[in-house]
Amino acid sequence: MTIEFSNFSFRYESLDKPTLRNINLRIEKGEKIVIIGPSGSGKSTLGQCLNGLIPHAIKGEVSGSLTINGQETATFAMHQFTEQVGTVLQDTDSQFVGLSIGEDIAFALENQLTANIEMYSLVKATAKMVDLEQMLQRSPHDLSGGQKQRVSLAGILVDDVDILLFDEPLAALDPKTGKRTIEIIDDLHRKTGKTVVIIEHRLEDVLHRHVDRIILMDGGEIIADTTPDELLASPLLAQYGIREPLYLTALKSAGCHLALDDHPSSLSELPLANYQHAMADWFHQANTTSNHIRSETLLDVRNLTYSYDGEKNALEGVSFNVQRGEFVSILGKNGSGKSTITKLIMGVIEPDDGTMHLNGQDLSELTIFERSQKVGVVMQNPNHMISHHMIFDEVAFGLRNRGWDEQQVNDKVLEALELCGLSKYRHWPIEALSYGQKKRVTIASILALEPELLMLDEPTAGQDYRNYTSMLSFIEKLNRELGITVVIISHDMHLVLEYTTRSIVIADSQLVADAPMTDVFSNPALLDRANLTTTSLYELATRLNMAETNAFMQHFIDVEKASRLEKTVERNVA
């Protein structure tokens, strides 16, 4: 089932310029390819052309040709696309049509008037392929993120399509579930010989299993069509703002030259003996870092317990504290209870048991509004927080609610916008901003209120590496220069490793660890319990037989932090 784009371009109806430009790409039957690129590069648009959403659901101007199995798709009806291309979306909830898993998998067969006896055996066989055969009576909406993806996958496998398209399948998954998803996709690819196309930001996670080719896109064009080894041996990832595997960053920091023949796409195949001396010398340059923790407690949580349904606890007896000026992470798999902590601190829900004190004051004595003056929360999606048309008015909203006079409001808003690098946009409409800039507006709105604690819920969600690095470097600067206390809630292991100093780990509604981040990340048993995984930095240290794994990881963190600080200084000078 060959796919071929020839001189293919596409322009959205509402835009002046094309989003895809002169795409020439051939994907052979049975290949597994990955499409990567920064936000706005055109990779998702390319996927929508492949599955027929463009031009059937999304209108625009198409030029050039797209053929599937030698057939020109310009004349395809929508059903002809769906008979050949099955798509698993990032938002799996939007794909469910049945009340039970069995009904959802059977949907396509019912449309084809398949006999019940045949349908039953096909549904059972397909469910078994994705390890769901014991769950056919359950509602898909009651499942975890990884289980939901398997239901969506089964729904297209039962239709026996030849091409499987995955649009950012790892975006909402915790590390262990994401790893399992890549393994399931790989198993299906090897067993069925289907053509697999994966659109994804998280390149290192996708490379957990073999892929044939990687397509790098930027500005609506194909920049590179190459093997994983060729791409990772080149400077293209850094040039186009794509996060490279952590082990490669560490090796390059030590001055190790990585050639194509070294197989840089696979840590297990790298000739690490060749780099042993360079890595040892690099590590011996390390200065002993002591993350000084201030003795003054800002947030004190004791025996926090909460249940959404009165039966199963979302949190059970959780206790921890956050010192003033710390940069802390709360880790855990999807559904572990970590976001419940944010809701309890905000006052959106009240605990069944336990206490929360901020700067010595019992939060239960404060209203939601009063808490919002002390605790600033940045949600995953900035569009859920924004309520005004203009940037200035959005940042001024909280101050005006406090009854400040307009001159005070003006001065404070300009100060917050300047701090967030948005002062030149103060008279702009919010719709004109990028996703990352909108996030900065929400942060500016919170900083204007001078909160004592800043909490960010999954700050990397929906952002590519370049955008989220820019935002987190900014948050790091606020923490370093203004002493703002920051708590990040995430399951992005790279983010937590590079930016935070201490990790609070939640698993199955309970606190299982509260320790320096390097201690947590060098404890495979603990990470496994929390449905997290060790990073490739830890794997590299282990394979190099580093006796002090924690110190090795800390040195890497210090080097990266110094590099970020140096780049910030250079930008300020420029």
UniProtKB/Swiss-Prot annotation:
The UniProt keyword set, sorted, is: ATP-binding, Cell inner membrane, Cell membrane, Membrane, Nucleotide-binding, Repeat, Translocase, Transport
User: Does the keyword field hold Repeat?
Assistant: yes
Q: Which sites bind ATP 2?
A: 332-339
- Give the GO cellular component terms, alphabetically: ATP-binding cassette (ABC) transporter complex
Q: Which InterPro entries match?
A: AAA+_ATPase, ABC_Co_transporter, ABC_transporter-like_ATP-bd, ABC_transporter-like_CS, ABC_transpr_CbiO/EcfA_su, ECF_ABC_transporter_ATP-bd, P-loop_NTPase
Every ABC transporter domain range = 3-244, 299-533
Q: Which top EC class applies here?
A: translocase
Question: Where would you say this protein principally sits, based on its record?
Answer: membrane
> What's a Pfam family this protein contains?
DUF3744
Q: How does it sit in the membrane?
A: Peripheral membrane protein
Under Gene3D superfamilies, the record lists: P-loop containing nucleotide triphosphate hydrolases
EC number of this enzyme: 7.-.-.-
GO-annotated molecular function: ATP binding; ATP hydrolysis activity; ATPase-coupled transmembrane transporter activity
Where does it reside? Cell inner membrane
Please list the residues that bind ATP 1. 37-44
What job does this protein perform?
Probably part of an ABC transporter complex. Responsible for energy coupling to the transport system.
**What family is reported?**
Belongs to the ABC transporter superfamily.
Instruction: Output this protein's name.
Output: Putative ABC transporter ATP-binding protein VVA0347
Which organism was this protein described from? Answer: Vibrio vulnificus (strain YJ016)
